[in-house]
A protein has these predicted regions:
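Acidic, Ser/Thr-rich intrinsically disordered and amphipathic helical segments
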Residues: 15, 44, 103-106
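A short beta-strand-turn-helix
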Residues: 9-29, 70
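Short cysteine clusters
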Residues: 39-42
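Thiol-based oxidoreductase modules, predominantly thioredoxin-like and allied folds used
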Residues: 10-12, 34, 45-71, 78
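Non-catalytic, surface beta->alpha helical segment in thiol-disulfide oxidoreductase systems
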Residues: 79-122
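Chalcogenol-based redox active-site neighborhoods
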Residues: 2-5, 30, 52, 58-62, ...
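N-terminal targeting signals for export/organelle localization
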Residues: 1-8, 123
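Conserved beta-strand elements of beta-rich interaction domains across eukaryotes
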Residues: 15, 36-37, 68, 89-91, ...
Length: 123
């Protein structure tokens, strides 16, 4: 898998599917940032998302440009950017729409703890 502590840019549906599958097999939380190059709030939140990735190496952070990989955005019904989709065991468990750095940070911390606890108890 890619480097821990980094945001992984997705450029193909196959990349996304592979990383989600690997993350699910490892019992990891996956956070997907649906973004667009022309979106000012997306540019605002990008460095914060990157810092969250560095601070939460047990979580997989993916970035999907909705104009580049439309199929993934359509699959998840994304129609506003940024949208953050939280996945666990191939299921969406939470969604945040908008560049709310406090809400994003709190939810990543909460769900990362929960994912780590469930991975430990099932090991």
């Amino acid at each position: 898998m890619a480097e821990e502590g980094q945001v992984i840019g997705i450029h193909k549906v196959e990349e996304f599917d592979t990383l989600v599958k690997l993350g699910n097999e490892a019992g990891k939380l996956i956070v997907v940032d649906f973004t667009a190059s022309w979106c000012p709030p997306c540019r605002f939140i990008a460095p914060i998302f990157a810092e969250l990735a560095k601070a939460n190496v047990n979580v997989i952070f993916l970035k999907v440009d909705v104009d580049e990989v439309k199929e993934i955005a359509e699959k998840y019904g994304v129609n506003a950017m940024p949208t953050f989709v939280f996945l666990k065991d191939e299921n969406e468990i939470h969604r945040i729409v908008g560049a709310d750095k406090v809400q994003l940070g709190n939810k990543v911390a909460e769900l990362a703890r929960s994912a780590a606890a469930s991975a430990t108890s099932s090991a």
